[in-house]
Amino acid sequence: MATGKIIQVIGAVVDVEFPQDAVPKVYNALEVKGGATKLVLEVQQQLGGGVVRCIAMGSSDGLRRGLDVEDQNHPIEVPVGKATLGRIMNVLGDPVDMKGEIGEEERWAIHRAAPSYEDLSNSQELLETGIKVIDLICPFAKGGKVGLFGGAGVGKTVNMMELIRNIAIEHSGYSVFAGVGERTREGNDFYHEMTDSNVLDKVSLVYGQMNEPPGNRLRVALTGLTMAEKFRDEGRDVLLFIDNIYRYTLAGTEVSALLGRMPSAVGYQPTLAEEMGVLQERITSTKTGSITSVQAVYVPADDLTDPSPATTFAHLDATVVLSRQIASLGIYPAVDPLDSTSRQLDPLVVGQEHYDTARGVQSILQRYQELKDIIAILGMDELSEEDKLVVARARKIQRFLSQPFFVAEVFTGSPGKYVSLKDTIMGFKGIMNGDYDHLPEQAFYMVGSIDEAVEKAKKL
């Protein structure tokens, strides 16, 4: 192992000088010796003259020039396999849950090539989530990529927790959760939520919180992805949850300028599309197994044209857009049924009945949206009888799109509901056909299946 010396420290970026004949490769892991705590650096650039520029995976406080640095001769390696289930790890794969060693049989490098073209598989199978609005409007493909888009505080993390809970309990699959640059409190809540639902032994948790240095946040998504790839290569169908993909971009922005790159649009790194591609191209399904990924995407200032969410859009099969306007009506999950899309919503994939129901729901809601201005100025009485009926049904549909979540029982005070796709289609079809025109709209708010709405109406 070659040894070098630190010659410069600028925040999270550290320059190390090695002998000319032993310069480490790009992405190699280097370990700083003689520091107070273990610190790993990752080589980003070779500057010439034996000098490499690295990103620190931990805090660079206390580093000084002249400290010895040892080349590990391989990229950062993390534990993979069943030993990681039920554990919380950091970017380096070290346990942070005080439960002792991981006890893994194998470690994999976090930088890997994406599967080759001939290994990829294309599946048309749907993944039922039990969340009405998602299953109806933007169905998920097994082995597909889903983005949860939303501004601050509209429920991305809660939606994600509900998905993990439903999939672990109803489909008994393995999940990997990568917390990228999110709040420590959320990570803690998440851990306890998984423990309470008895699904912790089916989830591997990898955290790099907001307070961690940018190098840590930039690589923690790859750590989680590597663990998911191992499960996939064992022939399993695994779920990968990334919360939040925007912070991954942001970490890249933070180190980009320090690495000496010129910023591009809105101050983002010039390599934005490539960095996103490196991560997204590996999240894919092969002939052995599948990775279905759900990624939360923070939308800065609710602007979907910002370069970061716009770059993410290109990679996704389904987009679930969470809207502040819908959240303000008290309708949760606050999914916007007119803005959310899925490639799977095709009669050849989901069947004609599902397709017609989803499009019918959207057209009624769209018409209601158009009539809102007239109602605001002239009032309901000025509408034609036909339009009054559309408005009444649209308001019922809007309320029926809400649903009590298992993970939000604490907030809502009502027990969570899992609704099968069959019941979802039956319910919305009934409302559209006018079977429930006699029920008050409050009966449809925060219920599971349509039968519950009928029961609730009797009590009102």
Swiss-Prot record:
The lineage of its organism: Bacteria, Pseudomonadati, Pseudomonadota, Gammaproteobacteria, Enterobacterales. SMART domains: AAA. Its main location: membrane. It is a peripheral membrane protein. This is ATP synthase subunit beta. InterPro entries: AAA+_ATPase, ATP-synt_VA_C, ATP_synth_F1_bsu, ATPase_a/bsu_AS, ATPase_alpha/beta_chains, ATPase_F1/V1/A1_a/bsu_N, ATPase_F1/V1/A1_a/bsu_N_sf, ATPase_F1/V1/A1_a/bsu_nucl-bd. Its EC number is 7.1.2.2. GO terms for molecular function: ATP binding; ATP hydrolysis activity; proton-transporting ATP synthase activity, rotational mechanism. Disulfide bonds: none annotated.
